[in-house]
Every structure is written in C-alpha cells, then in structure tokens.
Design a protein with these regions (language model features):
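Cleavable N-terminal signal peptides of Sec/SRP-targeted secreted and luminal proteins
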Residues: 3-20
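Structural signal for hydrophobic/aromatic residues that build the beta-strand cores
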Residues: 10, 77, 105, 119-121
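Extracellular receptor-binding modules and their adjoining Ser/Thr/Gly/Asp/Asn-rich linkers
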Residues: 21-56
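Extracellular attachment/recognition segments
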Residues: 58-108
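Eukaryotic short linear interaction motifs
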Residues: 86-87, 113-115
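Short, structured beta-strand segments at or near domain termini in extracellular proteins/domains
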Residues: 114-125
Length: 126
C-alpha cells in the first residue's frame, strides 16, 4: 500500500513539474464568481526592470480610495500573468481578499526582469 502511495505521489510531482514548466505562467486565481456578480475592477499592472540583479515590485489596492457607504463583497480575484514564458513576476494577496470588501495585491518581479499582469476583481453589491 505504501508503494502505491509513493508511486502516485511521484507521478503527481512529475506531472506538476512538467506542465508547470510548459505553461510558465504565474497566474493568481482566487475564489469563484456567481451569477449575480459584476466586474468591480480591472487594470493592467506592468513594470520594467533596468537592474540586472534587482527586482521591482508594486502594490495594487481595491477600492482605490476609501469610499464610505460602499457595500460590496469580493468573490473572485484574478491576476493573469501576461508573460507566459516563465519570465513574469509573482502576485500575492497581502490584505483583504475573497469575502472581504477590499484587497491589496503585491506584485514582484524575478531578478533582472519585469512583470506584466491583467488584474480583474469580481463581486456583488448588497
């Protein structure tokens, strides 16, 4: 039984490593939108890097400014890496997120490279 589990684990690991390298994107997709959700925010976030060993980063927040009386719930957050050749950056949620009314996403490049992401946030008003 342990041998079967080990073989299954190795197979899954090999498939993950193989297809991860073929795809080469660093997409972030959190949550799932429902039938009554609307597009709340959309933005292209890109930054180039002129330092050969340095990295660049940027934070994107929604809502952009604090709007009092705005009652929303975020249901899906997508940050799609537009550089599909494994040379793009990485996206992390650092504050808020799904089931919150706000989110902050931190983007960071790989060393010596920039990044290019398309960010979309879906949710609904209540």
């Amino acid at each position: 039984m342990a041998n079967i589990s080990l073989v299954a684990l190795l197979l899954v690991t090999c498939l993950y490593v193989t297809y991860g390298k073929i795809n080469g994107s660093h997409d972030l997709k959190v949550g799932k939108r429902g039938f009554n959700d609307v597009l709340l925010f959309q933005k292209t976030v890109s930054k180039s890097n002129w330092k050969p060993w340095g990295t660049v980063s940027e934070d994107v927040s929604f809502p952009v400014k604090k709007e009092y009386g705005l009652k929303i719930v975020i249901t899906e957050i997508d940050a799609f890496d537009l550089d599909k050749d494994d040379k793009g950056g990485y996206a992390y949620i650092t504050e808020g997120g799904v089931n919150y009314n706000n989110v902050t996403i931190h983007f960071k490049s790989q060393k010596g490279l920039g990044f290019n992401f398309e960010v979309t946030i879906y949710g609904h008003y209540y």
